[in-house]
């Protein structure tokens, strides 16, 4: 099989590429800079230039390819709405059209559980009516819809929705800021928002990378399917706080803020973040709405059809991650 992965040098992409190489696959990976090209060459991955913002580069990724794994994305929760739609929605639709045109046999798309959004009656699953909370999740959901529209013309696809990724190598996203806030004794290691009973579900990057590899290995069972990949259980925020405090050697959280008070305080840090261009979502008011809504999902479908079996539990994975952060 001729396999190409976009975003092959990113956080998830790096783990996925390593996983496939360890299984004996050969593959191509896209890059957008000379430094990233060298990273791929060092792994014996054939580098292919592609930039989500330059549509003319898309044919490079789909030519002479049987399976295209589209991992590249505009990933932030504090970005520009126009870029979400340009780079996540429109670019995905055009790439899927190019894949169909060039005879790609399977288009595997990395979406997110943010395409589902918060869940009123957890756990949510692949059939849960979506109600994404952030523009990032809305863009992922719209990209999924684009893929299904193109699939009506003959494109074979698989959509994968990982939950919140974490693990060694992760920087500058919501998991990174949340974990390092505890590791460095920041604001979120001192005070919690609300009562802490809301459910949250994480996914270690290595488990998700292995899940994507299973999709490649089980093409028949994964055809035109949607899968959620995550750890096999959710945690209350209180449980997460306890785990992080123990690992970081911090005293247990004793104090909490009401969501209303937290929003008032964060209105000042929100303004600061906007002025400074700081993408840390923990400084934004809308983090309160996120923390006070359930994000818990079932992975039973992936277990049943793919044989997906995540190895990492949160305490083990967070300990490994914090040690990597140093």
Where are these regions (language model features)?
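Glycine-rich Rossmann NAD(P)(H)-binding loop
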Residues: 6, 167, 192-198, 227-234, ...
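Conserved beta-loop-beta element that borders a ligand/cofactor-binding pocket
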Residues: 144-168
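A conserved pocket-lining segment of Rossmann-fold NAD(P)-dependent short-chain dehydrogenase/reductase
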Residues: 180-203, 207, 211-214, 228
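Conserved Rossmann-fold NAD(P)-dependent oxidoreductase catalytic core, especially the SDR/UDP-sugar
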Residues: 94-136, 158
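Amphipathic terminal alpha-helices
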Residues: 293, 297-305, 309, 313-326
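Mid/C-terminal beta-alpha module of Rossmann-like enzyme folds, strongest
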Residues: 215-282, 299, 315, 319-320
